[in-house]
Swiss-Prot record:
Subcellular location as annotated: Plastid, Chloroplast
One of the protein's GO biological processes: amino acid biosynthetic process
GO molecular-function term, one example from the UniProt record: metal ion binding
The organism's place on the tree of life at top rank: Eukaryota
Temperature-activity note from the record: Optimum temperature is 55 degrees Celsius.
Name assigned to this protein: 3-dehydroquinate synthase, chloroplastic
Family: Belongs to the sugar phosphate cyclases superfamily. Dehydroquinate synthase family.
Gene (name only): DHQS
One of the record's GO cellular component terms: chloroplast
Keywords: Amino-acid biosynthesis, Aromatic amino acid biosynthesis, Chloroplast, Lyase, Metal-binding, NAD, Plastid, Transit peptide
Amino acid sequence: MAAFSLSAKQILSPSTHRPSLSKTTTADSSLRFRNPHSLSLRCSSLSSSSNVGRTRLMRASASSTAPVMDTSPTKAVSSAPTIVDVDLGDRSYPIYIGSGLLDQPDLLQRHVHGKRVLVVTNSTVAPIYLDKVVGALTNGNPNVSVESVILPDGEKYKNMDTLMKVFDKAIESRLDRRCTFVALGGGVIGDMCGYAAASFLRGVNFIQIPTTVMAQVDSSVGGKTGINHRLGKNLIGAFYQPQCVLIDTDTLNTLPDRELASGLAEVVKYGLIRDANFFEWQEKNMPALMARDPSALAYAIKRSCENKAEVVSLDEKESGLRATLNLGHTFGHAIETGFGYGQWLHGEAVAAGMVMAVDMSYRLGWIDESIVNRAHNILQQAKLPTAPPETMTVEMFKSVMAVDKKVADGLLRLILLKGPLGNCVFTGDYDRKALDETLHAFCKS
């Protein structure tokens, strides 16, 4: 059967931030270990058959039933947040999701340790939201003092030099172990602030306030923190969980269209690997998501967080199951590293990487052509690339993938789809010919 189109989709030019200015059920997952380098994962849609402990994991005030959204915008109303719990025993924490949450100071203040706070943000987000966050931290709480450090914006600054600016501010401010770091921004800020919190004085409290779709549905949840190295993305870091994640969906009002689309790549990922019902909902509602329908976005964020929280609760340190959340990331990280950090947004690279992973899955005979076409079509609807940049070569992919974090004993393990939609494997047990064929199909040399 013919493969889908391999033409690279043109990327929208970068844009800056625009100052504007239920009951929940869980997935029933069954794991089968075939060999030390292979994890097979069958994931049904979120169902009510899970046990009571798992249900507590996903507590939420809004229904998980997936309504079909229209594309007409509605005015967001501040109300009690939806809460999704990440169940990690005595290190469990809530994810608050809703509109106007930054106007509810108690949500933040209940998770602040001590009287000293350092807000880590960037030059794009600070002019829009820093004062609001400082107000939320100090309103009715005059004994709390807040410092801030404003970092340059962009993936290319996710490095040791920039990280040192956080440590400089913390040390100059004489912060102690009773302080709290607050990450205010997208995935880069969350990753760096979390790593700084994990390292400063061997670990201090921190809170995530993600302001992009990408960070809200993925990077702020689960405790992955770190920085990039010139030889590879996220090679330096730690697992370090926040005290809470506060997702004020109003922050998406100032998010550029390109950043919105980038975050939707991770939303699509959850549907492909473990939640077929969610994928089908996305197919019906992608126009509403692209039009920023508040109800559609709130549902997509909640459902994504439920999927992520369940996986993290079962496999915090990515020994197997959690690795499946990296569908497309091995190819995508190679694009980001080879093409240059910041040239493509993370979600853009992941989108192209997912198309490559799906293509390889099809070449292995593990999925049928309908899944190939559906994955391709939904990413196109989201205005995301479906092929890597033309400058990427087979050798560039191979050299970067050789140092990927999922390499074990010299064997590159990949997340690939296998079986019906919503099923995947994390494995090193595959025909290398299929990988070569995929790379050559998407690269000119």
